[in-house]
From Swiss-Prot:
One of its GO terms (molecular function) is magnesium ion binding. InterPro entries: ComB-like, ComB-like_sf. It catalyses: (2R)-O-phospho-3-sulfolactate + H2O = (2R)-3-sulfolactate + phosphate. The keyword Cell cycle does not apply. Its EC number is 3.1.3.71. The gene is comB. This is Probable 2-phosphosulfolactate phosphatase. Keywords: Hydrolase, Magnesium. Its cofactor is Mg(2+). Belongs to the ComB family. NCBIfam families: PRK00886.1-5 (NF002056). It is an enzyme of class 3 (hydrolase).
């Protein structure tokens, strides 16, 4: 198994797909996806385009769907939800499909959707992702950060490092043997420095500051937890994620 970390979807190799792609958008899309599925959501379907989301979701009965839209950190007008995982309670999401479009996370998922296996990862479900990698041993693994509008993101890179760090620890293989690019080593180093204060890291991150200005402190606190959910969101058909416990 070789791990490759890409800081944004735009940095992934063109005309290639890996055996397993892991999309990361800690703040907040992949944290929300894991939360919805853990709370009993039927599925999460991701869209880059809001108009397409509305058109596809119209085919579903209102009682079986939820629409979540976020642009610039704020909720899209007319949608039931924004991108806060804390709004995704079992009472609201159980048995329903969440149709979601966000500024960054859904772009990363669209880029890798043709990979043989596509997973979503956040700190909250890191252990489930690592367990899958160790059990299945895919040959080439991309961990793709969502970034912010094409730019580097501290929190996504730290999460990529958290995954790689745990794979190294549990496989007892040296990092240089698992690392397919230098970004893996730097991501592990970033996570190692901040693993005991991820909330502090979020406060330094540009998107963390953006969410704090929107008074989303509790979201940051929730998303900074590690290994609190056992859910593994896995793509069942293009753009549609269901749980693998």
């Amino acid at each position: 198994m070789k791990l490759f970390v890409y800081h944004t979807p735009e940095l992934t190799p063109k005309d290639q797909v890996p055996d397993c792609a892991i999309a990361v958008d800690v703040l907040r899309a992949t944290s929300t996806i894991a939360t919805v599925l853990s709370a009993g959501g039927e599925a999460v379907q991701v869209f880059s385009d809001l108009d397409e989301l509305i058109a596809v979701s119209e085919a579903w009965p209102p009682q079986k769907r939820l629409r979540a839209g976020e642009r610039g950190g704020g909720k899209v007008t007319g949608f039931e939800l924004g991108n806060s995982p804390l709004d995704c309670t079992p009472e609201l999401v159980e048995g329903r499909r969440l149709f979601i479009s966000t500024t960054n996370g859904t772009r990363a998922l669209k880029r890798v959707q043709d990979s043989a296996t596509v997973l979503t990862a956040a700190f909250i479900n890191r252990a489930a992702v690592v367990q899958y990698l160790l059990e299945k041993q895919p040959e080439i693994v991309w961990i793709v950060g969502s970034g912010w509008e094409g730019s580097y993101s501290l929190e996504d890179t730290a999460c990529a490092g958290a995954i790689a760090h745990s794979v190294v620890e549990k496989s007892q293989l040296p990092p240089e043997e698992l690392a397919g690019n230098d970004e893996v080593i730097s991501a592990i180093a970033l996570y190692s420095q901040w693993q005991n204060n991820l909330l502090g890291l979020f406060h330094h991150a540009s998107h963390g500051k953006r969410l704090l200005r929107l008074e989303c402190y509790e979201d940051l606190k929730y998303c900074s937890q590690t290994d609190v959910l056992t859910v593994l969101p896995i793509q069942q058909e293009a753009g549609v994620f269901k749980t693998k416990n």
